[in-house]
Design a protein with these regions (language model features):
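Short catalytic-site patches enriched in acidic/histidine residues
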Residues: 33-42, 139-142, 152-157, 164, ...
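A charged, amphipathic alpha-helical module
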Residues: 161-164, 168-171, 175, 182, ...
Length: 232
């Protein structure tokens, strides 16, 4: 995470750009591979990360411009999670690191949004890309999946902010470029006739020194092909 002042400044600029209404930020949830607790590697929504910085599942947030409120909605970890993860900071402590002082249980976001809807307050949201997001919009706001109308001002506000990079963002981009170069060099050193593509992918993952957010982009999705330079 960056400093809390960075996230506070980003949110303040967005509020100034949009001007009024309520901004809804849908965080991502865990996604099970073959049962609920055996999950794929988690990736937080990029917009949620940009404005709130918290890379944890099961969170959503609102910026209520009209009432000058910034709230993160989420639940504390249960003992089942703590067994696997060890002692963790509370959600309130995590949120304070992003400059958010108000945290509420996740179930309360539905009531908050419905109250705003009944008052005629504009509710801005971004395009959905997961079924879970569509289900939440239907549950909270009665928006039928496929009938979403994302807020154009919200989209433009986010895009215009993210187009311009701060020095600390550029530093992180440069680190990512170094990792990418290391992965390419590792692949070049590893590949040879008779090796499986999965071995090349494994070398890239280990050689990058960081856990990848996305799979290695090699020619075949399954990585089960043999390298044979005699074939075209």
């Amino acid at each position: 995470m960056f400093s809390k002042e960075t996230y506070m400044a980003r949110r303040a600029k967005l509020k100034q750009t949009i001007g009024s209404g309520l901004l809804l930020f849908l965080g991502n949830d865990e996604s099970g591979m073959n049962y609920a607790d055996n999950t794929y590697h988690f990736r937080q929504d990029s917009t949620f990360l940009y404005f709130f910085g918290l890379p944890y599942a099961g969170l959503s947030a609102i910026i209520d411009i009209d009432n000058d409120k910034e709230i993160i909605f989420g639940d504390e970890l249960t003992i089942d999670a703590i067994v696997w993860m060890g002692t963790q900071p509370t959600l309130k402590e995590k949120s304070e690191a992003a400059g958010i002082k108000e945290v509420r249980p996740f179930k309360e976001i539905e009531t908050y949004l419905k109250n705003a809807q009944q008052k005629g307050q504009p509710i801005h949201y971004l395009p959905t890309y997961r079924a879970e997001h569509q289900i939440k919009l239907f549950q909270w706001l009665g928006i039928v999946p496929g009938a979403e109308k994302p807020s154009v001002p919200f989209i433009m506000g986010v895009v215009n902010q993210r187009n311009y990079k701060s020095e600390e963002e550029i530093a992180e981009i440069e680190k990512a470029c170094i990792v990418t170069a290391d992965m390419h060099l590792t692949a070049m050193r590893t590949v040879r006739p008779g090796i499986r593509e999965s071995d090349v992918a494994a070398g890239c993952r280990c050689g990058s020194r960081f856990r990848q957010q996305l799979p290695a982009l090699l020619p075949y999705h399954r990585h089960d092909q043999w390298a044979d330079f005699a074939q075209p």
